[in-house]
């Protein structure tokens, strides 16, 4: 369990909290997709920018990525060894 996706049904269900606590417990960096999707002043990243950020993360040996964004789901799913729903 080195490359982990944390997804859920909607916002506010505890994905971020769970991912943070899991990351602390197993000493793996946690990446919250909202940080990469939302730029200053609530401007949305382009699909290219958002995808590139995730490609950089999944190239690492260990990661936890938290978030539901379906338009880039495959980037994470193809590289994850564990998916937690």
Description of each model-found segment:
Residues 1-5:
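Extreme N-terminal starter segment of soluble prokaryotic enzymes
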Residues 7-8, 66:
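Residues at the beta-strand->loop junction immediately N-terminal to the Walker
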Residues 11-12:
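Walker A (P-loop) phosphate-binding loop of P-loop NTPases
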Residues 15-16:
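Walker A/P-loop
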Residues 29-83:
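Conserved nucleotide-sensing/catalytic segment adjacent to the nucleotide-binding pocket
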């Amino acid at each position: 369990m080195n490359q982990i996706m944390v997804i859920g049904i909607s916002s506010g269900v505890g994905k971020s909290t769970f991912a943070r606590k899991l990351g602390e417990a197993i000493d793996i960096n946690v990446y919250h997709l909202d940080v990469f999707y939302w730029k200053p002043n609530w401007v949305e990243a382009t699909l290219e920018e958002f995808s590139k950020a995730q490609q950089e993360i999944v190239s690492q040996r260990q990661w936890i990525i938290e978030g539901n964004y379906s338009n880039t789901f495959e980037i994470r799913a193809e590289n994850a060894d564990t998916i937690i729903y």
